[in-house]
C-alpha cells in the first residue's frame, strides 16, 4: 500500500552549556527498544497545528510547559513502515525535567559523548541521521 505522509515533531532540548538531552526508549517498545533518541518526538494529530502538537508532546514527555521552540529544519523520513514529514525544533532549557513514566528516563549528553558513541547501536537510526 502507499504510505501516507504524516507530520511529526521533534524537539532537541539543550541546556545552556550546549549539552543535548536524550530520552531512553523502553525495552517494550516495538520500534528501537532500549535505544537513546531525540528528547521529544510525536505525531501531529488530525486538526492540530505543529506548534500545538509540540507543546502537547513536550508536556507529556518531559513535563515542560514554558519553553521557546525554534524551528531548525524539516525533512521527509521514510522507513519500511511509514513516511514522515519531520519538523525539527530546538530549545534551550535549564529547568527541571520530569520524564514521562512511559520512558526509561533520560539525561544530558555532551556533544563529545554523542560523537564517541555514534555507530555503536546506542542511538536510534533516525537520531544518528540528524
Q: Residue ranges of each PLM-predicted region?
A:
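Acidic, metal-coordinating catalytic segment for phosphate/diphosphate chemistry
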Residues: 1-10, 14-16
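Short loop/turn microsegments at loop-to-beta-strand junctions
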Residues: 8-9, 49, 104
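Beta-strand scaffold of nucleotide-dependent catalytic cores
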Residues: 21-24
